[in-house]
């Protein structure tokens, strides 16, 4: 068994497309995903799970029907299960998501922004 740390900058260097989460590690049934975001996403919710957003670079706004939260580099926020939300980034954001394996990025909405799931880099 090889014991090596995962270098996040190296992982971000392997892809440039946005809104396409890539799995970099798994712990129990949870996946750690890195993703580049810019612009507006779709309103959606995840009925069966919470979703953790950790901003590594840039500024992310997560809109809710009753307000918003702004996250800068080094900050995180957990969106509770069933809470409708919509991420937005004026400029590119590098982000880590932590969520159970198999959770679609568009939650209950589906559509053109739905990324292929379980893509490892």
Tell where the protein language model's regions lie, with residue ranges.
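A short, N-terminal "cap"/entry segment at the start of jelly-roll beta-barrel domains
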Residues: 1-33, 110-121
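Short glycine-/acidic-enriched loop or helix-start segments at secondary-structure transitions
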Residues: 64-65, 73, 89, 107
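Short acidic-glycine-tyrosine-enriched beta hairpin
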Residues: 65-82
